[in-house]
C-alpha cells in the first residue's frame, strides 16, 4: 500500500465505519483520469444506496482534507466475487479459498501466483500452489484477489 493509500485509509475509515460498513480497502490508480476506488462491505451485503451514502460522506471528508493533488474520480463498490485482499485478516478470513497474487518482486522468477490460502502467520501468507506450499510476505504482494468458482 502506498503512502497516499495509507493516509487515505486513515482518513476515511472512521466515517465509513460510522455509517455501519467495513472498509475493505482502497486503491488509487494514477492515469490520465486518476481513480480512487473504495471497497466496502457489511454483513447484509452492499447495494447502490449504500455506495451512494459512503460516496457522499467520503467526498465531504476528502473535500475538506484535500489529500489528492490531481483530479480523480471516486468509485465506491462492494468487493465483488473476485474480492480484493488487502490485510492479513482478509487472508485469514478466506483461508481455504483460491487466491490470485501479483507480487512486487518475483519469487522463483515469478510475479504471478495462484493457489489455495493455507495459513496466515503475522505478515506471512502460505499459499498451496500445485501441491506445494509457498510463503509470501504480505509486503511483497502488490495485488491479490479471490478466484470465484461458479
Curated annotation (Swiss-Prot):
Superkingdom as given in the UniProt entry: Bacteria
Species for this entry: Salmonella schwarzengrund (strain CVM19633)
Keywords carried by this UniProt record: Cytoplasm, Ribosome biogenesis
Family, per entry: Belongs to the RimP family.
An annotated GO cellular component: cytosol
Subcellular location(s) per record: Cytoplasm
Descriptive protein name: Ribosome maturation factor RimP
Biological process according to GO: ribosomal small subunit assembly; translation
Purpose of the protein: Required for maturation of 30S ribosomal subunits.
InterPro entries xrefs: Ribosome_maturation_RimP, RimP_C, RimP_C_sf, RimP_N, RimP_N_sf
Amino acid at each position: 500500500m502506498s503512502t497516499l493509500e495509507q493516509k487515505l485509509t486513515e482518513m476515511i475509515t472512521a466515517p465509513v465505519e460510522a455509517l455501519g460498513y467495513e472498509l475493505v480497502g482502497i486503491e488509487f490508480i494514477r492515469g490520465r483520469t486518476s481513480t480512487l476506488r473504495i471497497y466496502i462491505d457489511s454483513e447484509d451485503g452492499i447495494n447502490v444506496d449504500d455506495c451512494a451514502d459512503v460516496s457522499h460522506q467520503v467526498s465531504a471528508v476528502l473535500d475538506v482534507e484535500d489529500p489528492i493533488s490531481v483530479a480523480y474520480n471516486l468509485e465506491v463498490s462492494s468487493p465483488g466475487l473476485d474480492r480484493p485482499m488487502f490485510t492479513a485478516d482478509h487472508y485469514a478470513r478466506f483461508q481455504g479459498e483460491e487466491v490470485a497474487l501479483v507480487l512486487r518482486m518475483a519469487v522463483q522468477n515469478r510475479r504471478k501466483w495462484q493457489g489455495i490460502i493455507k495459513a496466515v502467520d503475522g505478515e506471512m501468507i502460505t499459499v498451496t500452489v500445485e501441491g506445494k506450499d509457498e510463503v509470501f510476505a504480505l509486503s511483497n504482494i502488490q495485488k491479490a484477489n479471490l478466484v470465484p468458482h461458479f
